[in-house]
Amino acid sequence: MCGIIGLAFAEGNSVAGALVRGLKRLEYRGYDSMGVAVIEPPGRLVVRKAAGKIGEVVRRTGVLSLRGRVGIGHTRWATHGPPNDVNAHPHTDCGGRVAVVHNGVIRNYASLRRELEARGHRLVSETDTELVAHLIEEYLGRGYSFLEALSLLGRVLRGSYALALLHLGEPDKVYFLRYKSPLVVGLGEGVNAVASDITAVLDVARDVIVLEDGEFGWISPEGVAIYRPRGDGGFEPLPPGALEERVKRVEWTPESASKAGYPHFMLKEIYEQPRALAETFEGIIEDPALLRAAGLVAGAGRLLIVGAGTSFHAGLVGHYYLSRLAGILGHPVVASEHKVYTPGVDGETVVVAVSQSGETYDTLEAVREWRGRGARVIGVTNVVGSALDREADVTLYLRAGPEIGVAATKTFLAQTILLQTLSIAAAGEAGRLTSGETRELTGVLEGAPDAARRAILASEGAAREAASLLKGAGSMYIIGRGLGGRLAMEAALKVKEVSYIHAEAYPAGESKHGPIALVEPGFKVYVVATSDSPEVMGNAIEMKARGASVTVVAPSDLQLDTPEGIEVLKMPPTGGETLLDPYSLTPYFQLLAYHLAVARGYDPDKPRNLAKTVTVE
C-alpha cells in the first residue's frame, strides 16, 4: 500500500524532482506521508520527509533544493506507528550512512527490534522499517558486502517487503530486495530505476523487469544486477541471457496516466470505459489462453471465484453467467475469507482469481494456499508480470490501461466482459452451447463498448442532478434481483467509497426479511432492473408504499409496469440481452458516486482510509 521509487542518473542534479514526479504517479496507492533520501556530492546522505500531501511536504521540507544523481523516495500508508514526521520514510541507521524505504509488513519486527536495542542500536520511530537500516549497519560492520547483507536480510525478515536502499559507501547505486511485495526495475537511457509500480518509472524508462520473490541487487546509471538466493544459503547472479529475456516493453505513455483535462482521474476513467472494453474484448477473443482457461473451468470438479472489493463483485457477475450459460455452479469467495474453503480444495479444484493489480495480498494468499493443495489457477489481472500472473497456470489479461483512481471503474467493466467471454467459452467447452450459439453470444458482446458509451452520455446529467438532491443523505439502499443484485453491490460500494454516504445493497427479495424496517418517508432507494428480473418492480412498489423515494434504473426497452410516483431512469436498450445490462446500467451509478463526492466537497480520487492496491494483510 506504500509506494517506493529509486533512481540513478548518469549526470545532472535533478534526481529530487524526478523522485517527486514518480511519487506523484504512486499517489493512487494511498498515502499519509512522503519522503526522499538523496546522496549529495561530495558524499552526504540527506533525508527530507514529513506527514502530509506530496506538494505540501515538498514545499515544507525543501525537497527540490536537494542536489544529486542518486536517490530513493516513498509514500507511506501507516501500518506500524501513526502517520507523523518521525514515522515517515526514508529511515536511516545509527551512523546515517544507510537509508531505506519499504512497502510491506515485517511480521517479526518486534523481536528484531528488541534484539537490536539490546545491542545498543537507537531506533527513533515506531515503524517496522527502521530496523532494516540497523540490520544492514550491523552486517556491514561485521565485514559483509552490501549484497551479502541483503542476502542475510532475506533470511532474517518474516513477512512481505519491497526495499530500496542507499549506502554512502557506494554513492552511485540503489540497492533493492523483494519478497511478496511488488517491485520492478526500469531500464532507461542514462538512468535506471526501481519502483513499486511501472507507472512510477514511465518518465524515465519503458523497458522493465518484474522482480520475483527473493531477488535482490542494485541499479546504477550504467547498469543493473539481479541476484537470487541458493538453497545452500548463498546467492548467485541471474544466468547469462536471463536478464535480457525478462525485459518487457511498456507501451503506456506518461500522458495515459495523467488526467487528460478531466478534473479527476475517476471521471476520466469512467469516460475511458468504451475504449477499455473494446481493447479487453478484442484482446481476449484472440488470446489462446481463453480456450485453455475455458477447458479448465468446464472440467472442474469444483470452481472457486476469488477476489476482493470490486474484483469480488466482478467475480459475482462472472459466477452469474457461468451458472446461466454453462451450468457451472461455482462458489464466489471473498479473498480474506478464503481459509473457510481450504479444507475442500484438492486437485479437482479450479480457481478463478480476479485482481486488477495482480498484487492484492488476500487474493494471492488464497491462490498460494490453494495451489499448495493441488488447485489449478486462472488469473484475471490488468498487470502483465504481476504476482498473480506468475502464480497462475493460465492468465487472462485485462487491457484497460492504468487505473489511477482508487475507486475502480473501468477495470470493473473490463473484468466483467472478460468473465462473460470466459463463461461463453466454457459453456461451449462443456457442450451447453453449440459453436453457432457461442459465436452469436460473443457477437452480442461486441456491442458492450457502444452500450457503455451511450450509458455514460445518458447518465451524466441525471447523475449530476441526483447528486445535488442527495448530497445531504445519510443512507440509501441499492437493490436488485439476479444480475441486478450483483450490479447493485458494486454500485453501493462506489457510493460508500467516494461520497462517504452509507449505501447498502442486498437482493431485493430480502426486503421483507428485515431491511424494509429502516424505510421511512424520504428514504432513498435505487432499484437496478435487469433483463432477467422485471419482477423487481414489485419490490420498488413496496418501498414506495412505505414512503421511500424510489428510482428505478433500467434499460429503456425493458417492459416495466411502473405506477405513479416511482422515477424510472431509462438507460440504453439492451435488446433483452442480460449480457449487455452491466454496460447499460453501471455507468449511472459510477457517475452518481463521483458527483456525490464532488458535491459534498471530497476528492473522489483519494477516498479516506483506502488504498488502490492492498498489498498487506
UniProtKB/Swiss-Prot annotation:
Q: What is this protein called?
A: Glutamine--fructose-6-phosphate aminotransferase [isomerizing]
Annotated Glutamine amidotransferase type-2 domain residues: 2-222
Q: Is Ion transport tagged as a keyword?
A: no
InterPro entries documented for this protein:
GATase_2_dom, GFAT, GFAT_N, GlmS/AgaS_SIS, GlmS/FrlB_SIS, Ntn_hydrolases_N, SIS_dom, SIS_dom_sf
Its biological purpose is as follows:
Catalyzes the first step in hexosamine metabolism, converting fructose-6P into glucosamine-6P using glutamine as a nitrogen source.
Q: Which UniProt keywords apply?
A: Aminotransferase, Cytoplasm, Glutamine amidotransferase, Repeat, Transferase
GO process terms (BP): carbohydrate metabolic process; fructose 6-phosphate metabolic process; protein N-linked glycosylation; UDP-N-acetylglucosamine metabolic process
Species for this entry: Aeropyrum pernix (strain ATCC 700893 / DSM 11879 / JCM 9820 / NBRC 100138 / K1)
EC annotation from Swiss-Prot or TrEMBL? 2.6.1.16
**UniProt xrefs under HAMAP family:** GlmS
